[in-house]
C-alpha cells in the first residue's frame, strides 16, 4: 500500500510540473509585438545645436521648432526637434 501512495504522489508531482511548464510556454508564445512598438507609429527626434536653461519665466535658449528637454529637476536641458 505504501508503494501505491508513493507512486500516486510521484505522478501528481510530475503532472504539476508538466502543467506548469506547459502553461509557461503557452503564455510566453502569446507575448507578441504590442501596438506601442509598431515602427509605423515611431517619431523622429533630432538634437538641435543649442542647449537651454531654466529662468524665472521658463525655459530659454531653443530656437525654431526646437523645444527644451531636461532630466528631473535640472535647470539645464538640451534643445530637441520632434519633427
From Swiss-Prot:
Known glycosylation sites: 51
Keyword terms of this UniProt record: Disulfide bond, Glycoprotein, Secreted, Signal
GO molecular function, one term: C-X-C chemokine binding
Protein origin, superkingdom: Eukaryota
Protein's cellular compartments: Secreted
Secretion signal span: 1-28
Gene Ontology CC: one annotated term: extracellular region
Cysteine pairings via disulfide bonds: 48-66, 52-68, 62-79
Major subcellular site: secreted
Role noted for this protein: Salivary chemokine-binding protein which binds to host chemokines CXCL1, CXCL2, CXCL3, CXCL5, CXCL6, CXCL12 and CXCL13.
Protein name: Evasin P1124
Lineage: Eukaryota, Metazoa, Ecdysozoa, Arthropoda, Chelicerata
Amino acid at each position: 500500500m505504501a508503494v501505491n501512495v508513493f507512486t500516486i504522489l510521484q505522478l501528481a508531482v510530475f503532472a504539476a510540473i508538466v502543467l506548469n511548464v506547459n502553461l509557461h510556454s503557452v503564455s510566453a508564445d502569446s507575448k507578441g509585438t504590442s501596438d506601442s512598438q509598431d515602427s509605423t507609429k515611431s517619431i523622429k527626434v533630432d538634437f538641435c545645436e543649442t542647449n537651454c536653461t531654466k529662468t524665472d519665466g521658463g525655459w530659454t535658449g531653443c530656437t525654431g521648432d526646437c523645444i527644451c528637454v531636461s532630466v528631473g529637476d535640472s535647470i539645464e536641458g538640451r534643445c530637441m526637434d520632434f519633427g
